[in-house]
Structure formats: C-alpha cells, structure tokens
Amino acid sequence: MHQFPLNSKRNSNFEGTKRNHNIVKYESRKRRHFFLNSRVGEKKGQSEIKRKIIKDEDKYNIIKDIKKYCECTKKYKRLPTREVTIGNVKIGNYNNIAIQTMTNCDTRNIEECVNQIKKCKDLGADMVRLTVQGVQEAEASYHIKEKLLSENITIPLVADIHFNPKIALMAAEVYEKIRVNPGNFVDGRKKWINKVYKKKEFEEGKLFIKEKFVPLIEKCKRLNRAIRIGTNHGSLSSRILSYYGDTPLGMIESAFEFSDLCIENKFYNIVFSMKASNAYVMIQSYRLLVAKQYERDKNGLIFPMHLGVTEAGFGANGRIKSYLGIGSLLYDGIGDTIRISLTEDPWDELAPCKKLIENLKKRIFYTDKKEEASYSVMKKQNKEGPNYSRDTPNNDNDVTVMKNSLSREIQSCSPEKKEEAIIYKAKENSTVHSDNDVYQTIEHWNSNCLNFEENFRDFNNIVKNRVDKKVKSDVLHEECTVGNVVTVKELEDSLQIFKDLNIELDQNGNLKKGAKTTDIIIIDKFETLTDSAKKTVKKLIEIGLHVLVQHQPQNIDIVKKLKINDSSSSYNNNIIFYTHLENMDNILEYYKDEMQKNNSKGYALILNGKENIKMVEKIKNLDPAPLFLLLRSDTVFEHVLVTRRVNEIIHSLGINVPYIHYVDIHSTYYEDILVNASLYVGTCLIDLMGDGLIINVTNYSSAATNTATVANAQKDEKQQISSRVSLNSFLTLNILQDTRIRLFKTDYIACPSCGRTLFNIQETTKKIMKLTGHLKGVKIAIMGCIVNGIGEMADAHFGYVGSAPKKVDLYYGKEIVERNVPEEEAYDKLIELIKKHNKWQDP
C-alpha cells in the first residue's frame, strides 16, 4: 500500500467532525472584503494602467487580432496539442477526449468522497476533481487516496486550489493534477481598493507570482504531476483587471503569466481552461487562446484545453448552455477534456458528456481529396480495430481521419468502396432514407461547394446581419424570429396548439402574443387542411402570427378560397408562400400580381446551402426581393457547414436579405434531440449567423421524453413538453436564450456545487427558479460560495450567495446589500430586493 506523509497533530478523518463555524465566518468575512470590486481611479502625470470598464455585449468585439482560431472551419481537423499525462490518462495529441466531473461533498468526509469517486468512475469518468481549500482537506486527501488504492482504483484525481500556494504543495503529494486559478492563486487575497497601478508595479506583480508559483512547478515536475491553469471569467486579479478589464484577453494574459513560468522551468505538463458562465464569452476566450498560442507556437507548444461552461445550471437549461459552449469548440477541433457543470449530482454530468461526444461523431464534412475519402472508408470498415477511438481525431497534415463518424468523405472511392461506405452510412444515420440520396447529395456538393473560404465571419467584430426595419416590424421579430412546424392534425386541436405556441390571454380573456409566442408557423401538407384546422389558422392570423405555405397550385387555390371567405387584410397579408430557390421564377410571377393588388407582404425562398453561387446571386436582382430566406440543410449534421458557406456567399454578393434556420431533427431520444439542436444550430447562432430559428422534431412521441435517460432535475421541464410542437418551441426558445439573442425568461448563473457549498444548492436553485422564472431579462446568480471571486456572478442583476452554514448574502450587482440572512428568510428577501429595484413582474 502507498504511504503518504501525515500531520499527526491534526485529525484528518472527517467522519463525525463538524466544521468550526467561527472559522467559516472569519473566512467569509475576509473573502467578502477581498472581493469588493471598485473602479480604478486615474491620476494625471503618472504612468498608469487604466482599468477598462467594458459592457458585456462589447466583450466579443474587443479582440483585434484573431486571424485563425482552429485548424480548419470547413472540415474536421483536431487541434494538434502537446500530450499531457495525468496519472494513467493521456490527453492532447489526438488522444480520446477525457470526461471529468467533481465531487460535491465536503472533502473531509473521506467515506463519502470515496463513494462518489467510485460511482463516477463506474459511470465513465476519466478523472474526478475535489475541492482542497485548507490543511484539513489536504490531509483528508491522503486517506481518500489510500482507500482508493487499497481497492485498486487508480482514476486520476484533480485538486481544486484557490488562494493558498502552500495547500497546492501539499495537494501535489496526492493528486495527479493541480488546478490553480491565476486570478486568486497569488494576489487574490488582497484588498480591492481604488488602486492605480503604475507600469513598474504591474511588472513587479509578475515577480511575486514567480516566487509563489515556481515551487509548485518544481514539485509537480519532480512527481510527474500536471497543472491546469484555469482562468475564470469574473475572477481575474485586480492587476489584470486594471490593465485588460474583465475580458477574454484579460483571462488569457493572466493564464500566460503562469504558463510562461512553466515553460521557463521546462515543465510542459500543463492544461489551460478559460471558463465563463456566458457561453458567448467562453467561446471567444478559447478561440482567442488558440489564436494567441498559434502566434507563440515556436516549438509546438500548443497546450491541451479543458472545456466547460461554468455555473451552467441544471436540467435542459444547463445542458443546452453546455452543449452550445463546449460543442461549438469541439466541432472545430478545440478541446481535450470536458466537464458539463450541472447543479446536479456529480455522476449526472457524465451521460451528457458522452452524448455530446457521441453526436459530434455524426458531423458531416466533405472532401475532394482521394486519399482522405479512401482513408475514411477504411476506418469505417475497421472501426473496431486497434486504432478505433470514441473520438474523431485527425491523423496527420494531409489526411482527415473520420473514425466511426457519419462522414460523407467517400465520393472519390472506387465504386466498390463507395457502395460499401454508402451502405454503412445508411445503416448508421436514420436521417438518410436511401443509398441513392446519399450518392446524389455527395455529387451535388462536390460540384458546387468545395471552394468557399471564410472571410465574412469576422471574429474581431461579430455582428448580426442588418435587416430592413420594415421586414422586421411586419414579419420578423426585432431580436430573432421564432418559428414552428405544425401539421393539419395538430391544428385541429386549437386549445393545445395555442398552448404549444405560447399564446397568452390578456386581462379580458382574449388571445394575444407574448414574449415567447411563436412568430411564424409552417403548415405541413397544407393541401389537406380541414375545416376545423382552417378555423385555427384564422385565429392564429388574427393574433398576429404569419403562416408559411408551400407555393404550389393546390395550395394557391386553397388560399384564394380562404381569402374570398374572409376578406380581412390580415388574412390576406399574413399568409406567405415559400418555394425552393430553383423555382423562384414561378413564385416571382405570382407575387408581382398579388403585391400589385396589395394582397400579400411578400414571399420567402428556401435553400439547402449547396446551391451554385450563380444561382444564389440571382436573389440580389429579384424584384420584388424575398422577405427572407429559409436555410434548410439536408440533415442537421451538416447544418454548421452549409450555414458558414451561405453566410459567406450572401455577404460576398452583398445580398441584404435575412435568413432563418429551418432544421429537421430526426432523433428519437430526448438527450439526442437536445444535443443535436443545441450543437448544430447553436454553433451558428452563437456567431450571430441567422435571423430566426425553426426547429422541427419529426420523430416525437410521448414516450420519447419518458424513456430518455434524463436527470430527475428535468421533471419540471418535461411538464412543459406535452406535444411535438411544444418541444419545438421549448428547444427554439432555450437555444435563443442561451445564445443571448432573444431573452424570454430569467437567466440563471447557478454553480454546480462542491465541498465548499454551504446549503443544498440543488433544492435552492429549483425553488428560486420556481419563484422568479418569469422575469424576462433578469439575471440571478445562485452560488454556494464565491471562491472564484465576486465577479463569478458575471453580469447578474442579483446574487444569492452562501456565506455560512444555512446563511446567505444577497447582492445587487457586485454590491452586497444584506449579510448572513437565514436561509428560510432569504427567498422572500431576494424577491423584496428584486421589487426594490423595479425588476419584479407578477406571474
């Protein structure tokens, strides 16, 4: 058995021992004192570093030098990072993407920690993190490790360290990886005063970091440990804040101060992380980190990255936010380990991680290189061979290895190989209906779409398309349009469809549009419209919804009859025909006549993203121009690729027509639906590509949500999903909420809990969400503590933060307004605080 040094003067066995409440209160007071945030002043005549006060919406646009953030945005190439060893797990260098989680019990509770670690290992965790905030926790860690080794459990453990370099040195005796936060490892425990840093003082801070951090580097180097340099948005040191502001650039420069010391001391077993509760900021931070490493990459020193959206929350909300942030980076080949930080039990984080990786394998890319296509097919045929990986790594500079993925990189193969690959594709992907479909799609793509380059997705100044105000006010929502697809049968149940489309009642009991009401609906098989369905359509139009109908002779006749029977202007104008781009001449001729009669607002065109550029260019000269485009990819797994292509084409041609994502989700299980909608659509919207979203879940049944492996925390969400249409609405609105494109409810920053948490975070979060979930645009932080700093609450309007066992501090912005509120009173006090600042609305 391994022996570890113990301090005999302390009782490191937690069982039956209670925390000293006086110590907790003392530490809490100190933390509150250190985390007080104040604006740095300015004095004339001094060489100063000014604190930058930057609005949240501008944080994406302050970066001036992102030229390349990944290997390729058109096809999958894993970022080539150094291989790092963490115990018996290797990450980076095309190794499997490692999955990790974190215990949520007190680290001094040895038995409970061991049980949690064992359960996480059994359910697929590659490593487990524990909080180590003091000497007692560090000493308890020795016993935890001994118990695990006695049962031959060698899963790597990660120590979460804040504030105390001495504790980090102790933890290195036990843990395979030490996570340090540059924002508080050295100079986090200090008074945040109106300090103006001179250049000399700023540089002296680096010497202090060297003094405290190098001993840990030397010890980890000697013991073959790894170090994660984990920066958190909102927890930067006052030095960094004074120079860079609370920005992605500040996060990266803070991390580089630590990594440069590692490199100077020839220690390369390091991992980066750039976490934020805002997926928008998190993605930009990692992209900038990669871009900066490309610039600094003289000796192949691009280090692996751990991905995570911190304080994501629980249930579908937490999953969607994480799938957006983590998935969009993995899609572009960035990331070597992941954690989905949920306000749930540690093991509940593992299944979503697996689902994300599993569904990422289905992404579709295309190639015109014979060796790539042949190699891809070979790997598919030998997917259980010695080189099989659960990931989709890149092998070398010239060969894209799509191991066990649903790639279509097969067009250049011999006829025999191509046929085998097509059969494999058809078996694996339920969205492909025949071998012939796959073959035709491949050929169509190769002839048109392999030559685009991204120039207009400007990473330095990401902005939305400018849309004609008249179109916005008349048809599209001013922020982002919400659409849905309904069938005739669903329209026959008017009460259910009103509920599913989030139509509200006014004080007189009349139907009206609300903050989350659907804006446009597409009626599937409109030609089969029944009398009862017609009545529902009429009511929806009266409320203000727009109805999209496919332009074909039978449907035109039905619409004419409807207009004859009801001559109201809304009925005439709110039905909009759409057709495929190649049929534009027919619809154009029809609409010239209709618009002259003032019978219609316009029309829409649908495209799949594979059209010839010359065909798309015709849109520019159409008169009248289409109101908007519907971008409907052949399968969701290629939607990111075709969106990037279409975005380039319409910008390069100067086409000022908005486009709406129209995505069919053919998955059966709820978790797959969540992943595919969030990942393949959210990745586009997070870059502000697109002006609306229509999600169409095609294989929904009531059993789909009941049989899926979804955590218990999602029971309340399932009650919102009573039908296929309601699921479409739920997905669309939550994706728009988490991309922060269109807010319709309260936004929560909820920590996942750890050994520092001072109350039941899961139950507390549920209760606060139940009380405040209707407050559109309000942001509430629910934190077990604020160990990473008061800025960890990000841009929350209000904060509910643990200060002592069953005691809570309440914040307005970054200002503490009430201390040590008893937990049973804190909910009412929070609502009073919200009302005081005029953010409350009655449900």
Regions found by a protein language model. Give the residues of each.
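N-terminal organelle-targeting presequences
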Residues: 23-59
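Active-site beta->alpha loop and helix N-cap motifs at the rims of alpha/beta catalytic domains
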Residues: 125-257, 484-640
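Beta-strand/loop-dominated core regions that host nucleotide or nucleotide-derived cofactor-binding catalytic loops
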Residues: 533, 805-808, 816-839
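Short, acidic/polar
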Residues: 108-119, 164-168, 322-326, 491-510, ...
